[in-house]
């Protein structure tokens, strides 16, 4: 099977991650997945949401948005509408959950790391790109806490990355572009850690149903893609990559609280 952009079924689009893309943020990255491009910045706020005050641990949250002309037709800015849309709220909650899964929250103290993920060009896979690029920005932001003596070790327990898989014309395919995503019979978004544990699996049949065997082969394909993405995260983080996971013995803070943003 030759896909709409010439790739093989198990082939990802070219992925590039540019670290330190924003000179002001504690951590930042530009991630390019094919023609999808997302700027991710991580900022540290020395306070936590009300529900965590006095708990002695931190929080990781995210905001997600798209530039008006990130797509073929100009969209209205959500700031003009006065509130984020339902899709943006769903995506930013997914990003927050995914990143919290690999953070030692007690080691943060009562601090919040805020990820801003802004899509400057969309061609499918914006939410999965935001998670993968957001992780790199998160790690650099966390390193500032080590540099400042807030914590002796990087409070990141594992890698996390995400990709999409789906059934397109009956074939299992990896990393769907927009044209494939729009026409796929089944579409999954998969988030996994570097040690191979699932954080989230979102799967939908678009006008059709699917079997357990389809789920298995789609997840197997997602594992291949996410392993590749984690290797790229390792490469771009350089020497800092070796610090990730050194706190893995203390995972009590890695779980999220409820489904707040």
Swiss-Prot record:
CDD domains: RNase_PH_bact
An MF annotation (GO) of this entry: tRNA nucleotidyltransferase activity
Coiled-coil blocks: none
EC class of the enzyme, as a word: transferase
PROSITE patterns on file: RIBONUCLEASE_PH (PS01277)
Example GO BP: rRNA catabolic process
SUPFAM superfamilies xref list: Ribonuclease PH domain 2-like, Ribosomal protein S5 domain 2-like
Catalytically driven reaction(s): tRNA(n+1) + phosphate = tRNA(n) + a ribonucleoside 5'-diphosphate
Positions annotated to bind phosphate: 87, 125-127
Family matches, as Gene3D superfamilies: GHMP Kinase, N-terminal domain (3.30.230.70)
EC number assigned by the record: 2.7.7.56
Keywords assigned by UniProt, alphabetized: Nucleotidyltransferase, RNA-binding, rRNA processing, Transferase, tRNA processing, tRNA-binding
Family the entry assigns: Belongs to the RNase PH family.
Role according to the record: Phosphorolytic 3'-5' exoribonuclease that plays an important role in tRNA 3'-end maturation. Removes nucleotide residues following the 3'-CCA terminus of tRNAs; can also add nucleotides to the ends of RNA molecules by using nucleoside diphosphates as substrates, but this may not be physiologically important. Probably plays a role in initiation of 16S rRNA degradation (leading to ribosome degradation) during starvation.
PANTHER family: EXOSOME COMPLEX COMPONENT, EXOSOME COMPLEX COMPONENT RRP41
Record-linked NCBIfam families: RNasePH (TIGR01966)
Subunit annotation: Homohexameric ring arranged as a trimer of dimers.
Protein known as: Ribonuclease PH
Gene name linked to the record: rph
